[in-house]
Curated annotation (Swiss-Prot):
Keywords: Ribonucleoprotein, Ribosomal protein, RNA-binding, rRNA-binding. It comes from Clostridium botulinum (strain Loch Maree / Type A3). The gene is rplR. The lineage of its organism: Bacteria, Bacillati, Bacillota, Clostridia, Eubacteriales. PANTHER family: 39S RIBOSOMAL PROTEIN L18, MITOCHONDRIAL, LARGE RIBOSOMAL SUBUNIT PROTEIN UL18M. Belongs to the universal ribosomal protein uL18 family. This is Large ribosomal subunit protein uL18. GO terms for molecular function: 5S rRNA binding; structural constituent of ribosome. SUPFAM superfamilies: Translational machinery components. Part of the 50S ribosomal subunit; part of the 5S rRNA/L5/L18/L25 subcomplex. Contacts the 5S and 23S rRNAs.
Length: 119
């Protein structure tokens, strides 16, 4: 019997393939992105120490937008970039989390680039 793969399993498999190649350091942390139905989350991770350096999401108190659309994702990208620049982090490695580089993921990346992050 053939078994149909669901989207979440396929995304997890893609994410594992991407994570084999992408590694964040303290000088150039990994910008990890997660997308749910209602919100979008981003964090800068130092994989050497295993610590989150900066995080931003559409579920934060200061967020004035909708996390389930592209405009909200762009705002989260700008928020993460501003927090990173405050900590002196300019260069990052982008980890799309197994999601296709399209829609909200792409807007978050473009918002972070516009606000000053380099990747």
């Amino acid at each position: 019997m053939f078994k149909k793969n669901d989207r979440s399993q396929s995304r997890e498999r893609r994410h594992m393939r991407v994570r084999k190649k992408i590694f964040g350091t303290a000088e150039r942390p990994r910008l990890s992105v997660y997308r749910s139905e209602k919100h979008i989350y981003a964090q800068l991770i130092d994989d050497v120490e295993g610590k989150t350096l900066v995080a931003a999401s559409s579920s934060e108190k200061g967020f004035d937008g909708v996390g389930s659309n592209k405009e909200g994702a762009k705002l989260v990208g700008k928020m993460i970039a501003e927090k990173a620049l405050e900590k002196g982090l300019k260069k990052v490695v982008f980890d799309r989390g197994g999601f296709i580089y399209h829609g909200r993921i792409k807007e978050l990346a473009e918002g972070a680039r516009e606000a000053g992050l380099d990747f």
